[in-house]
């Protein structure tokens, strides 16, 4: 059985709050494709793998993206150069960067913090999806 790494040896992360201005509603898979293509076009495969982008949450037009701490400037520059998606204009605005999801939601997206156990209780009350 594998042991987990201690916190001092884990990769440091940053969380980025994004606002995507596009004339149509985008889904999570579209946002992932936009971010990966932007990184690939700007810094190539190596830069994309070092940045290690991961979409945490997305509700049109706002999203939270997890990236590597050392590659914040790489992500900023690659997203600022992105101006087209499906031959339509797109603008990606970085609202802010923090080291925790909670701070990104509260400070930049103005979403109040809700403890995780309350979210699970709400999902149990709704029942299974049909």
Swiss-Prot record:
Enzyme class: hydrolase
Localization in the cell: Cytoplasm
Molecular function as annotated in GO: ribonuclease P activity
Entries under SUPFAM superfamilies matching the protein: Rnp2-like
Domain of life per record: Archaea
Function: Part of ribonuclease P, a protein complex that generates mature tRNA molecules by cleaving their 5'-ends.
Complexes and interactors: Consists of a catalytic RNA component and at least 4-5 protein subunits.
Protein name: Ribonuclease P protein component 2
Native source organism of the sequence: Methanococcus maripaludis (strain C5 / ATCC BAA-1333)
Taxonomy of the source species: Archaea, Methanobacteriati, Methanobacteriota, Methanomada group, Methanococci
